[in-house]
Regions:
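Bacterial N-terminal signal peptides
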Residues: 10-23
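N-terminal secretory signal peptides that target proteins for export/translocation
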Residues: 1-7
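Short, well-ordered beta-strand elements
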Residues: 335-339, 346-365
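Short, conserved catalytic-motif segment at the N-terminal edge
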Residues: 28-84, 105-107, 128-129, 166-176, ...
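Short, gly/Ser/Thr-rich active-site loops of penicillin-recognizing serine hydrolases
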Residues: 295-304, 308-310, 363-398
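Short active-site loop at a secondary-structure junction
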Residues: 44-52, 73-126, 133-151, 176-188, ...
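Extracytoplasmic/secreted proteins, especially bacterial periplasmic and envelope-associated proteins
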Residues: 30, 34-41, 92-96, 107, ...
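Short, surface-exposed loop or secondary-structure junction motifs
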Residues: 123-336, 341
Length: 398
């Protein structure tokens, strides 16, 4: 009888333990010296000249450190060095958009045509920066633009290529029915920026996105972060290195482009990431929308864009677009991430909802990308972040 009771107790304990949520199996963040050693190893392996790393734990910024050099002269990279944020800008923009949703100025599912006073194709180029937005006149004969919503812009499902200027004819095209599938598109986010900046003032639009983001940066104490270059950023600026180890001058972007004009530092950016993972500055509903499974991603890789869909049996079941981020489910539960890349830049932010834990990595050497998967795993443990989809065999290549 006692033996049977003991077996029953063990069975109950086993069932209970198997139902414990992911958060209960908390990962331990490595010490600062351990992170330093791992970063130095990865920099050696990838031939990287510079990296900067920060850790967020329980929604608070923890360890922050910079490694290597910031320019070809050999000046040290430090935590206040201005670095190019690249496509991490998209994550910041999505957060800003959801604040406008909270304020009732935008609705995620209202077609953008309803936010404008005139048809989109009737708008000409910006008088100051002619290439700030897309050539919307190119859509005059394609009524599908009228279906595009803010949600589609933030989930990369507008049907646009990444940018109009990569099209063979240098024109803006819609390649598939808006909202039906994912294909990475900075152009879609630029369209949403246009509507926010030129939309109906009667509903609270006609706003400067640079001002909106700056208000958040000021609130969070991000004193050296901006979506547009200004004089205060002129000191302690990095250069980049391409995959051949050749230095690349830091581009000083004079116009706000939400697809990728942000400059930041490793001291600043984790403050935003911590606020995002906590939901600071957003309603609970808007915070949930950002990391919700919005749209299933069915391609083999993120790039090249406009890839065909994989057969259903080969699609990753947990891979979805969030709003401005990609979401996934792994050994530690639900997570989200965003990357940033250009010829001499490699960035990544990975967050796990359980424990509000994030790794923030900025690099001024594109070759660092090849070590991101190992470094994120070292800091956060096994997350399941889909770097195979993100990079394919292009990690570390310009």
């Amino acid at each position: 009888m006692e033996t049977g009771a003991k077996a029953l107790r063990l069975l109950v304990l086993f069932i209970a333990s198997s139902c414990v949520p992911f958060a209960a199996f908390a990962q331990t963040t490595p010490s600062g010296p351990a992170i330093d050693a791992e970063v130095n190893n990865i920099m050696t392996e990838t031939h990287s000249n510079g990296m900067a790393v920060a850790v967020v734990d329980h929604g608070k910024v923890g360890y922050v450190h910079a490694y290597g050099i910031r320019d070809a002269k050999g000046d040290p990279l430090n935590t206040d060095t201005i670095m190019y944020g690249a496509s991490l800008t998209k994550m910041v923009f999505a957060y800003t958009v959801m604040q406008l949703v909270d304020q009732g100025r935008l609705n995620l599912d209202t077609p953008l045509r309803d936010d404008l006073d005139n048809p989109l194709p009737s708008y000409g180029a910006d008088p100051v920066f002619p290439d700030k937005y897309g050539p919307y006149k190119d859509l005059a004969d394609d009524p599908r633009w009228e279906k595009i919503t803010p949600r589609m812009c933030l989930t990369h499902s507008t049907g646009f290529s990444n940018f109009w200027f990569v099209e063979p004819d240098m024109k803006l095209h819609i390649h598939f029915e808006p909202g039906t599938r994912f294909s990475y598109s900075g152009e879609g986010l630029i369209l949403l920026q246009f509507v926010i900046e030129h939309g109906r003032k009667a509903q609270g639009l006609g706003l400067d996105v640079g001002d909106l983001t700056r208000a958040n940066f000021d609130r969070l104490g991000m004193t050296r972060t901006s979506l547009v270059w200004h004089d205060a950023l002129e000191t302690n600026v990095d250069d980049g290195w391409n995959d051949q180890g050749q230095p690349q001058a830091h581009e000083k972007r004079k116009k706000v482009r939400v697809a990728g004009s942000m400059n930041t530092t490793i001291s600043d950016l984790p403050k935003f990431v911590a606020a995002l993972v906590r939901g600071d500055g957003l309603s609970a509903a808007s915070r949930a929308e950002i990391t919700k499974r919005q749209l299933h991603i069915t391609s083999a890789h993120q790039f090249p864009f406009l890839q065909p869909e994989l057969p259903v049996s080969e699609q990753r079941k947990d891979l979805y677009a969030g709003l401005g981020v990609v979401v996934f489910d792994g050994p530690q539960g639900h997570g989200f991430y965003k990357g940033g890349h250009d010829g001499g830049t490699a960035n990544t932010v990975v967050c796990i909802e359980a424990g509000q834990r994030c790794a923030v990595i900025l690099s001024n050497d594109v070759r660092s990308e090849a070590g991101f998967a190992d470094l994120v795993k070292f800091i956060l443990g096994d997350t399941g972040v889909p770097y195979d989809w993100e990079y394919g065999d292009h990690a570390g290549k310009s």
